[in-house]
Amino acid sequence: LPRLVGRAQAMGLAMLGDKIPAERAVQLGMIWQVVEDEQLQAEAKKLAEHLAQQPTYGLSLIKKAIHAAAENNLDEQLILERDLQRLAGRSSDYKEGVQAFMQKRTPEYKGC
């Protein structure tokens, strides 16, 4: 939490235990987005559909890098990201993305 919101904010949040309005959680960087209750299902479906059209293998590598960044020092993170870039560059989705770009068409990712 301190890495996410800073030491002072983390101390206040943890020690006071106050409820945080959703908008404040967005401001602190604790969550990404707020939607109205009645829009939650529709927004979740829209997001899932969007992500499913993306290069899911590449997205998994992005998640790995972001999660590791919380624990790694800079040198460790740079090495990890280099290695992940190599993996991504060898994937079928990478090749499809480049071909689609060159052919000016929408890519059709397969998740590998």
Label each region the model flagged.
Residues 1-59, 91, 96, 105, ...:
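Crotonase-fold acyl-CoA enzyme core
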